[in-house]
Regions:
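Short conserved segments within the C-terminal catalytic ATPase subdomain
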Residues: 116-127
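Short beta-strand/loop element within the Bergerat-fold HATPase_c
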Residues: 160-172
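Short conserved segment of the HATPase_c
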Residues: 185-198
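Acidic ATP/Mg2+-coordinating residue in the GHKL
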Residues: 180
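Conserved micro-motifs of the catalytic ATP-binding
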Residues: 93-97, 130, 134-137
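Short helix-loop "hinge" at the ATP-lid/N-box region of the Bergerat-fold HATPase_c
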Residues: 153-154
Length: 248
């Protein structure tokens, strides 16, 4: 009996050793892949910066519409690369965040400045109201969250649509709302818009959609302890609400 026990024990130990090796090898591969991905992102950013510089230096020689189209595509590539970069960082979130006082209005205005050219070209009517609040969060992650919501509103808005960004304060909570009068979301898509890779009806009609932005927004909100909700009526409006605990 004792010999049989030893045999079984050795078999178990051997399997455990093999499993540990498989796990360690996968972890190593994952880290290597992540490093390769970060290098790729860096490599992609360099030619993008060069193309932008060439456009700036030759803006008088290039047709304005062609220049705007190229600039728009570059901007889209930059945003896609940024999403991939943040997706790769998500696994190490616990090592890469700093909770501090963050001013909501400052972040929103910086994003609007970054996207100003596209707001103007679409003749979007922007309404900013009651944004001067501070919350406890990580500034760079929160910037990314807000940017995804604003770029989403911009992407699915038509010429002359409205985008409203405002805060609502209650005793225990602060809510930031991003509301647009764009194409809206179909009822059957609402429960799935935060799923990884889900593009829905709007995404299928828009080749620029990856299904990553809102997935990352939800994941980051969960990790930061913020709550995100969406309300929408198809062909009428979409409203995203982020709820912060009032610690300040």
């Amino acid at each position: 009996c004792k010999n049989e026990e030893k045999i079984y024990l050795n078999i178990i130990k051997n399997h455990q050793y093999q499993c540990n090796n498989i796990i360690n090898n996968n972890i190593k591969k994952f880290e290597e892949n992540k490093e390769i991905l970060n290098m790729w992102v860096h490599d992609v950013k360099i030619p993008i910066a060069i193309i932008k510089l060439i456009l700036e230096q030759n803006e008088n020689l290039i047709d304005e519409k062609v220049s705007d189209d190229i600039d728009s595509e570059i901007f889209r590539i930059e945003n896609s690369v940024e999403k991939i970069l943040y997706l790769s960082r998500l696994e190490d979130f616990h090592k890469d965040f700093l909770i501090q006082e963050v001013n909501i209005e400052k972040i929103i205005r910086n994003i609007i400045k970054k996207y100003s050219k596209y707001f103007i070209s679409k003749k979007i009517i922007l309404d900013l109201n009651n944004l001067n609040f501070k919350v406890l969060s990580d500034e760079k992650w929160l910037y990314f969250i807000f940017e995804q919501l604003l770029s989403n509103s911009l992407k699915y808005s038509s010429l002359g649509d409205n985008i409203s960004i405002y805060c609502k304060r209650t005793k225990n909570y602060l809510q930031l709302r991003v509301e647009d009068t764009g194409c809206g979301i179909k009822k059957e898509d609402l429960n799935r818009i935060f799923n990884k890779g889900f593009t829905g009806n709007n995404g299928r009609n828009n080749s620029k959609s990856t299904g990553l932005g809102l997935y990352l927004v939800k994941e980051l909100c969960d990790k930061l302890g913020h709550k995100i909700d969406v309300d929408s009526e198809y062909k009428q409006y979409t409203k995203f609400t982020i709820t912060f605990k009032c610690d300040l």
